[in-house]
Amino acid sequence: MPVEWCLGVSPKSLDEFSIETIKQLFLDQTGEVYSNQSVRHLPIPEWDGNLVLLDENNMIRGLLWANKFSATRVRIVAFAIDSDYKGKGWGAKAWNHMVDSARGQGFKEIQLEVRGDNEFAIEFYRNRGMEIIQTLEGYY
């Protein structure tokens, strides 16, 4: 199987190996440490706006997790891609799929948080029409 984005499942449904892989991805990409329970209990419903990037060995190399935050808004809970897959269009593919899915279900807004020092992510979101609405001092 080639590298591709696949529909994701709720973290509650993932096996321990997948949880460990996701924890390592979060650590590598954000510096944040999560417990198995904190990953498993993230509010991620099963819908076609949630994706995982699987490599040719069926290993998780990225994820875009979003939840239906309100009747009009989708909130990005996590968006992380392994460094070996960054800058190759994988993030854009996932983003476009999630946006199309959200619009198709009537959502009008997307909300997310990003670290102020994550220039790569900020540029990624700005290139897709996102703008900074508020800065949360001391959040990270």
Describe every region a protein language model picked out.
Residues 5-84, 95-97, 101, 105:
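Acetyl-CoA-dependent GNAT
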Residues 68, 114-116:
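A cross-domain feature marking catalytic cores of carbohydrate-active enzymes
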Residues 82-96, 105, 109, 116-123, ...:
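Conserved glycine-rich acetyl-CoA-binding loop
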